[in-house]
Regions:
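Conserved active-site and SAM-binding loop architecture
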Residues: 1-197
Length: 197
């Protein structure tokens, strides 16, 4: 029996980075959701087989083609250390909850079969936004897809990698070491620049 090719749907798609990565890994992109015209034109040209659904706020996961993997890299503006740090519940970054809603709707429609995996990408500042409570809310939201709750208290600091193991699911995270080092690299560069003036 041949292995079934994995399928992918990308929310907050940008220019199709998850789809391109998926193709390189043998995963077939099926749909995307994006509102910015230029990135949509890029993916329409590079990935004409991918169906574009537009604004994530107007989507219902039950109406989307069921996929094995849903990816989301929603706007990081409100949790980024480069931004105002308004947090996960702010207007742009709060779109994260649309990702979880769509996953739940698709799982309900498919009797829990799809999606099998969810991939969330964001900035390193998501760990520290709102003193770490925003990342806890992300984990709680993903656990809620399976109807579970996190009982552990929020740690003083989120580690760069970790996991939550449920009876029939798991959640894992890993922060890019490059992303962690970036603020330190910038600080040192600014110090060098200040000394040279």
């Amino acid at each position: 029996m041949a292995n079934k090719e994995l399928t992918l749907g990308s929310l907050f798609d940008g220019s199709g980075g998850f789809e391109l990565g998926g193709i390189l890994a043998g995963i077939m992109p099926v749909f995307s959701s994006e509102i910015e015209p230029f990135p949509i034109r890029v993916t329409e040209k590079r990935l004409p087989e991918v169906k574009h659904y537009g604004d994530v706020n107007k989507l219902n996961g039950a109406d989307l083609p069921p996929v094995d993997i849903i990816t989301g890299w929603f706007p990081c503006t409100d949790v980024s250390i480069a931004g105002k740090r308004e947090g996960l519940y702010a207007q742009r970054t709060g779109l994260f909850f649309q990702l979880v809603r769509i996953i739940k709707e698709m799982r309900c429609k498919s009797n829990g079969k799809y999606p099998r995996y969810a991939v969330w990408e964001n900035v390193f500042g998501a760990f520290s936004s709102n003193k770490g409570e925003d990342f806890r809310a992300v984990l709680e939201s993903f656990c809620s897809v399976k109807g579970c709750k996190i009982d552990a208290a929020r740690p003083a600091k989120w580690y760069n990698a970790g996991e939550i193991l449920g009876d029939d699911f798991s959640i894992a995270w890993r922060a890019s070491s490059r992303g962690k080092q970036l603020p330190e690299v910038l600080r040192k560069a600014l110090e060098r620049q200040a000394k040279s003036v």
